[in-house]
C-alpha cells in the first residue's frame, strides 16, 4: 500500500521518495492524470497551466512544476487524492486560490543543497524581463546586463525563481548581483499561497494553524 507523508506536517523522510510537499513510498508520475478525485468528488486537471511548488527541508530544496486541479471546496493538507480507479496517488499539499497541486513526478524540477546559499521566489510580471535578482522592462534589463558584464563572476550566493503566466525562469547570482546561471521553462505557472492545517491539540480541541508553504528547515 502506497504511503504519503506531508512535509508541512513533519513528514520528510530522506529514505523515501521526495517531491514538493511530500515524502512517499512510491514515485508516481502525476503528469499522466487528467482527472483526480478527493473524497469521491472528481476534479479535472487544468490544461497548460502549472503550479511551482517547493519544500525546504534539512537544507535541501525540492521544487517542481506540478499539475493542478480546480476545486471550490476547502481541502486540507494530507487529504488523500485518488485516480479514477480508486488508487491513492498523492495527498493535498499546496494551493493557489481555488487550485490545488498534484504532487509527485511533475515537469521541470530543481533539487538543490542550500548550504551557504539562499533561494527566493518572485511573480514575473507580464512584459518584464529578468537579469539576476531583478525584473524590469526589457531596455532597462538590457542596460543592467551590459553594466554587469564588466564584472568578473564570483561564487553563487542566491538563486531566484521567477514564475510567470507564460514562462518560468531560474537565475543564480553572485554577491554583486551578477547573473551566473539561468534556466528557462516554457510553461506558465502560479506560486502557491499558505494552506491551513487543522491540528488536534487535545481530545476535544482543535486549532487552525497557518502552515508555511514548505516545511521549516531543521536547525
UniProtKB/Swiss-Prot annotation:
Reported function: Nuclease that is responsible for viral evasion of host cGAS-STING innate immunity. Cleaves 2',3'-cGAMP which is produced by host cGAS following recognition of cytosolic DNA and blocks the subsequent 2',3'-cGAMP-mediated activation of TMEM173/STING, which normally spreads to adjacent cells and activates the interferon and NF-kappa-B immune responses.
Gene Ontology biological process: symbiont-mediated suppression of host innate immune response
Family note: Belongs to the poxin family.
Protein name: Poxin
Taxonomic source organism: Vaccinia virus (strain Ankara) (VACV)
Subunit relationships: Homodimer.
Induction field: Expressed in the early phase of the viral replicative cycle.
Keywords from the UniProt entry: Early protein, Hydrolase, Nuclease
Annotated site (Substrate binding): 60, 105, 169, 182, 184, 186
UniProt remark on domains: The substrate binding site is formed by the N-terminus of a monomer and the C-terminus of the opposite monomer.
Effect of residue 127 to E: In strain: Vaccine Acambis 3000 Modified Virus Ankara (ACAM3000)
EC identifiers of the protein: 3.1.-.-
Molecular function via GO: 2',3'-cyclic GMP-AMP binding; nuclease activity
Keyword Transcription regulation belongs to the record: no
Other comments on record: The sequence shown comes from the strain chorioallantois vaccinia virus Ankara (CVA), which is the ancestor strain of the modified vaccinia virus Ankara (MVA).
Pfam family, any one: Baculo_p26
Amino acid at each position: 500500500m502506497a504511503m504519503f507523508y506531508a512535509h508541512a506536517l513533519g513528514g520528510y523522510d530522506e529514505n523515501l521518495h521526495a517531491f514538493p510537499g511530500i515524502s512517499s513510498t512510491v514515485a508516481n508520475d502525476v503528469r499522466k492524470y487528467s482527472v483526480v478525485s478527493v473524497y469521491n468528488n472528481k476534479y479535472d486537471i487544468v490544461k497548460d497551466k502549472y503550479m511551482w511548488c517547493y519544500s525546504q527541508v534539512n537544507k535541501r530544496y525540492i521544487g517542481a512544476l506540478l499539475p493542478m486541479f480546480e476545486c471550490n471546496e476547502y481541502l486540507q493538507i494530507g487529504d488523500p487524492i485518488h485516480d479514477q480507479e480508486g488508487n491513492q496517488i498523492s495527498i493535498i499539499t499546496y494551493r493557489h486560490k481555488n487550485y490545488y497541486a498534484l504532487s509527485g513526478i511533475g515537469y521541470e524540477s530543481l533539487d538543490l543543497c542550500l548550504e551557504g546559499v539562499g533561494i527566493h521566489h518572485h511573480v514575473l510580471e507580464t512584459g518584464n524581463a529578468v537579469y539576476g535578482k531583478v525584473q524590469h522592462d526589457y531596455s532597462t534589463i538590457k542596460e543592467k546586463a551590459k553594466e554587469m558584464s564588466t564584472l568578473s563572476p564570483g561564487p553563487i550566493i542566491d538563486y531566484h525563481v521567477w514564475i510567470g503566466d507564460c514562462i518560468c525562469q531560474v537565475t543564480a547570482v553572485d554577491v554583486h548581483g551578477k547573473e551566473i546561471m539561468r534556466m528557462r521553462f516554457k510553461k506558465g505557472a502560479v506560486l502557491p499561497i499558505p494552506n491551513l492545517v487543522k491540528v488536534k491539540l487535545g481530545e476535544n480541541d482543535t486549532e487552525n494553524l497557518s502552515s508555511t508553504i514548505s516545511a521549516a528547515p531543521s536547525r
